[in-house]
Amino acid sequence: MKKKVMLVFGTRPEAIKMCPLVNELKTRKNIETIVCVTGQHRQMLNQVLETFNVVPDYDLAIMKQGQTLFDITTGILEKIKAVLENVKPDIVLVHGDTTTTFVTALACFYLQIPVGHVEAGLRTYNIYSPYPEEFNRQAVGIISKYNFAPTELAKKHLLDEGKDATSIYVTGNTVIDAMQHTVIADYHHPELDWVGDSRMIFITAHRRENLGQPMHNMFRAIRRVLNEHPDVKAIYPIHMNPIVRKAADEELGDCKQIHIIDPIEVFDCHNFEARCFLCLTDSGGIQEECPSYGKPVLVMRDTTERPEGVDAGTLKLVGTSEEKIYEWFTKLLDNEEEYAKMAHAANPYGDGHACERIADILEKGYTSI
C-alpha cells in the first residue's frame, strides 16, 4: 500500500525549496504525493509553481490585502482541518519557518498526524530575530516527528533541544537541488543588456524586522557606494510590500545605477544570482543560493540562522548599520583579495541531492508510517 505524503506550503521561498521535492516524490512508486498550498503569497507563489510544473491538489487561497499574522494564522487553521481530515495523510511535510509551516504543524498536532520538518534545526535563539520565523521553526521543532536537517550544525541544535537522534536526518538543502534545474548557460534577460559589462549587484530587501529605519540605512549605504563606483550597476526586484516600496523610492528612486523592478520568477532570480558580482540581501534562501555559484553575500540582518555560511566565509553578516554596509560593500568592490576569500569559500549547504535523500527515507526508511 502506498504511503500518503502530503506537502503543505504557502510562500515563494517555501515553494522554491518544496517543488523539487514534490517532483522527486512523484517518481516514487510507493508514495502517493498530495500538494496543498495555502496561498499565503499569491502571485509570487504561482510563479514558482509554474516554473516547476507543480499543480496543487488543494489551494486554501487565504491571501487578502493588508493581511496580518492574525489573518494568516486563523485563515489557514480554519481551512486546513477539512483538507487533512479528507486526505488522511500518513505524514505531512512542512518547510522551514513560515506562518504556513507553524499553523499546518499545529493543525497536524491537533489531529495527531505525524509531521516531517524539511530544513529543520535552523536557529538564532532570539524569537524576535527573524520575526516571526524564529518562533515558528522552534515551535514546529517541538511538534515534528521527523526532522530533515540541512547541515550537521542544524542537527546539533535539534539534539541540544532533546530531539531523538533517530528522528534527525542530515540531507543538505533542497534549494541547491532547485538551482540545478533553473540556472542555464544561455539565459537572457533585458536587465542583463542594461548591465552590459558593468559589475552587477543583486539586491533583495524585505524583512519585517528591517522595516523603518533599518531599511532606510540599507538603501542609503547602497546609494553611497553606487555613487562612488560608476562601473557598478544594481538590480533590485522589489517586494510587493508598500512600506518597502516607499522606502526604496525615497532613498533610491533617482539613482541611475540601480533598476528597481517588480518581483521576478525563481527562474530569473537564480540566473541573476549566478551572474552577479555579489549580493546584498536580508533574505534567508539567498544566503544558501549564491554561494553555490561562488558569489559573496552581504547579509543585511543583525542575526542569521545560517551561521555555517558565515563560518565557511561565503557570507558576511553586516547588520543594518549604514556605515557597516557601506564599509563591506566598498571593500568587496575595491579589494580583490577580500572578494576572492569569499568567492572561493566552500558552499556548506549541500550537493544537490537533498530531495533524493528525503524521498529515499520516506519510501524506505519509515517503518512506523
Name each model feature, range by range.
Residues 1-236, 241-369:
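Nucleotide-activated sugar donor-binding and catalytic core shared by glycosyltransferases
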